[in-house]
Amino acid sequence: MRVADFHFDLPEALIARHPLPERRASRLLALDGPTGTLAHRQFADLLDYLRPGDLMVFNNTRVIPARLFGQKESGGKLEVLVERVLDQDRVLAHIRASKAPKPGTRILVEGGGSAEMLQRHDALFELAFAEPVLPLLERVGHMPLPPYIDRPDDAADRERYQTVYAQRAGAVAAPTAGLHFDEALLEAIRAKGVDTAFVTLHVGAGTFQPVRVERIEDHVMHREWLEVGQDVVDAVSVCRARGGRVVAVGTTSVRSLESAARDGELKPFSGDTDIFIYPGRPFHVVDALVTNFHLPESTLLMLVSAFAGYPETMAAYAAAVAQGYRFFSYGDAMFITRNPAPRGPED
C-alpha cells in the first residue's frame, strides 16, 4: 500500500492557525461509513448523532508548555521541546541547536532555570533539571503548537490548545478532537443518556512526523504512553450489554482502546504503544469516531481510512476542501460511523 495514495491537495488558506471564538462554533462533517453519505452540520449538532446508551471515550491528557528557549553555558542558542517527562526532574527532549550539546553540557533556560544534558538516546536528549520540571514548564515554557500553525504561541493558546477536561499532564500535542467540547456540551451529552469515560494517552511530538517511506507497511510508528483503566473496560462492557455504541473522541482515544484490545478483548493496560492502524487492520472496540481533519499522507488519515473506508474518506476530504472546512488542530471536525466492510486503496 503506497503512502502516496493518501495525498490530497490542501490550499494553505484552509489551515486553521487560530481557534474560533467559541469551542463548539466549528463545523461538523458527518460521514456514515456504511453508506458513504455526507452531511454538513455544526459541531453543536453532534447531539443529533448520539443515542441514549452510547459511551463516549475521551483522552484526558494535559498538554504541558513543553517548548523552552535558552542557551548553552558557552553561549550557543538552542530550543528544547520536551517529549516525555521521566520523573520529577528528568525529561527526554528534542533539541534544536547549531551544534548538539554533549553530555555534561549545562543549559540555561530563558526566564530562569537550568538543566544538564546527561546522555543522548538516538534523536532524543536526556536532560536533568535543577528543579522540578513541571512547575518550571508552567512558569517559563511555551505551548508546543504544531509546526503547520507557524506562529509564536500566545496567552490564549494556554487555554484553547487544551481540552476543558484535561487532567493528567504529559502531552506535547493536544488531542484535538476534544478541543470542540465545552462544559455545556458535555452536560447536554450526559443529559441525553450518553455515558462518558476517560483514557490517557500522552501525545508525543512524533504525531507530526511525516511518513518517510514509500510503502505504508515499512513505516515504524513512534511510541507513546497510555493508560486504559478497569473503569473504562467496565464502561465498555455495560455499553455493549445495553446495545450502545463506543464513540471515541479523537484518534488518540481510538489508539488507546485498540491498543488495550490487541488480542480482541479489551483489558486494562498501562504502558507504551506503537500501534499503527491502516486499511486492513481490524477494530475491536470503537463504533464511531469524532476527529479533526488530518494532514495529507499522515498516519492519522490512514487510521480514518481504515475506519470509514478509503474511498469514503478521500471523498469526504475532497468535499471538505471544496466546502472550505478548516483543517488540522484548530480546525473543524468529523463524526464518522464505522464502515463494517471498509475498502483500501488497492481494493
From Swiss-Prot:
Catalytic activity of the protein: 7-aminomethyl-7-carbaguanosine(34) in tRNA + S-adenosyl-L-methionine = epoxyqueuosine(34) in tRNA + adenine + L-methionine + 2 H(+)
Instruction: Give GO BP annotations, semicolon-separated.
Output: queuosine biosynthetic process; tRNA wobble guanine modification
| Keyword field contains GTP-binding | no
GO cellular component labels: cytoplasm
Among the GO molecular function terms of this UniProt record, one is: S-adenosylmethionine:tRNA ribosyltransferase-isomerase activity
Q: Where in the cell is it found?
A: Cytoplasm
Copy the pathway line from the protein's UniProt record.
tRNA modification; tRNA-queuosine biosynthesis
By its UniProt entry, which InterPro entries does this protein fall under?
QueA, QueA_dom1, QueA_dom2, QueA_sf
Which EC number applies?
Answer: 2.4.99.17
UniProt keyword annotations, A-Z: Cytoplasm, Queuosine biosynthesis, S-adenosyl-L-methionine, Transferase
Pfam families, A to Z: Queuosine_synth
Q: Does the keyword Signal apply?
A: no
Q: What family does the entry list?
A: Belongs to the QueA family.
| Subunit | Monomer.
What this chain does, per the entry, is described as: Transfers and isomerizes the ribose moiety from AdoMet to the 7-aminomethyl group of 7-deazaguanine (preQ1-tRNA) to give epoxyqueuosine (oQ-tRNA).
This protein is called S-adenosylmethionine:tRNA ribosyltransferase-isomerase
State the organism named in the record. Answer: Pseudomonas aeruginosa (strain LESB58)
What gene name is given for the protein in this entry? queA
